[in-house]
């Protein structure tokens, strides 16, 4: 018997209703369903799950992807609300795609994920993230100083609101808001981006996917670590963490007719193009 787990946005009634309808449909097909905790943790009974379905937006999807990574199964995003980069299908098309997963004919796309581990002075379980790992300032009115090493080589010490290490999937999320580059998901890399750095150099680094990034909290202010916005961990001054590609990539269920990544970028950010009435501005030099 197939078993499908659900992670739902509890604050959206349409998401709750959609999840209940999908669960009823699955049960009528003879499948078992389980509602996973909203934080993306695993079923209390430890039973295996064949698919995790998120019903909501990209934030809900990230929690579902976290659970799916531990369960070793794919994750499918049913979009409710605003368009995102991760949710894949409208509620009306969800049953067809779920059926394809359970019979083994669905298209599965592997996405690089991240893991962060404690080093000297830090104490927390290793964390997994699909989008990003972030170390930010603890006090709102203070900056945090973070020394950056890549593969053992010292790079710089950022005095900033924080530092993000993102995957290509996460390059359109918080890293983008911090002026990081957009990287297509098939180009595996680590993207290191400072947040509002108070120094002349405030640009991102795009690193080899096999790189290991270490961040050390310097100065007098502690930092706060999180992965994909989940529960934060305080990092005292002098503590270090290591961030690298995870050995457990995310497995995303995709539609065969899904739009390409750059088409999503154009739609999401409203980029101008041939369909626009206005002529593009001249950007060449005068004369």
Locations of the language-model features?
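ATP/NTP phosphate-donor binding region
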Residues: 1-51, 55, 92-107, 118-127
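Short glycine-rich anion-binding loops that position phosphate/pyrophosphate groups of nucleotides
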Residues: 11, 57-60, 83, 169-171
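N-terminal glycine-rich "phosphate-gripper" loop used for MgATP/nucleotide binding
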Residues: 54-58, 65-67
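Proline-centered loop/turn at the N-terminus of a beta-strand
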Residues: 72-74
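Catalytic core of DAGKc-family lipid kinases
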Residues: 85-162
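ATP/nucleoside-binding phosphotransfer catalytic cores, i.e., glycine-rich phosphate-binding loops
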Residues: 135, 140, 151-154, 203-287
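Short aromatic-centered micro-motifs
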Residues: 148, 170, 225
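Gly/Ser/Thr-rich active-site loops/lids in small-molecule metabolic enzymes
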Residues: 157-201
